[in-house]
Amino acid sequence: MTAQLPEKVSDIFNPADWRVVEGFEDFTDITYHRQVERDENGEIVRDLPTVRIAFDRPEVRNAFRPHTVDELYRALDHARMTSNVGTVLLTGNGPSAKDGGWAFCSGGDQRIRGRDGYHYASGDTAESIDPARAGRLHILEVQRLIRTMPKVVIALVSGWAAGGGHSLHVVADLTIASEEYGKFKQTDATVGSFDAGYGSALLARQVGQKFAREIFFIAKEYDAQRMYE
């Protein structure tokens, strides 16, 4: 295997520990890497049983659009079907080049949200929406895949986990959050939507009915310590 290192996609990403997964080099909204062991010359000796899937839109706090979700599902499904992968690390690249902010995922990109869901668009504004394609809410399919795949999915939260991003951390098997930068917020009340998928049901099961309602109804920010408690 080659000694060439992948691009450094995040300040907390060590290229020497990873390689890009073959066949997924065309991703634009996420990155997909396989953990590797290298020898003293930097040559890859073997693949390790961990993959890293990361949102790669730090300039918008790693918000997802339909294209992002398409790529996320492809990567997760590939990891599910790869027999020598045991663990999936789900995280967000960063920080933002604009302001240095960190995010795991801030949920759906509100700029391309319509009445029927989030729309495919050629750009980042409502004017670039493709009117020939229906809106999508298929992040719920990703939630279902995470809950049913026979792999351990760990959410690594190094910044904001908000809205749909908060729900992704909830459906993951484990969450490891930065004590300094990890922030959690369910923004449904702010943007006028509701996660009727696994996110709300599992949150109530994990933290109790009353606290889950507080998280959803009040849209309050919680730090990593409070969410741990």
Predicted regions and their residues:
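Glycine-rich acyl-CoA binding loop
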Residues: 61, 65, 135, 158, ...
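Short, charged helix-to-loop "capping" segments that act as catalytic/coupling loops
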Residues: 47-48, 83, 89-107, 173-189
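Short, flexible helix/strand-to-coil boundary loops that buttress conserved ligand/catalytic motifs
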Residues: 64-65, 108, 117, 188, ...
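Glycine- (often His-adjacent) and acidic-residue-rich active-site loop
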Residues: 60, 92-141, 192
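Hydrophobic/aromatic residues within transmembrane alpha-helices
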Residues: 53, 90, 109, 168-169, ...
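Charged catalytic carboxylate motif
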Residues: 67-71, 138, 145
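Conserved CoA-thioester-binding segment of acyl-CoA-metabolizing enzymes
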Residues: 2-95
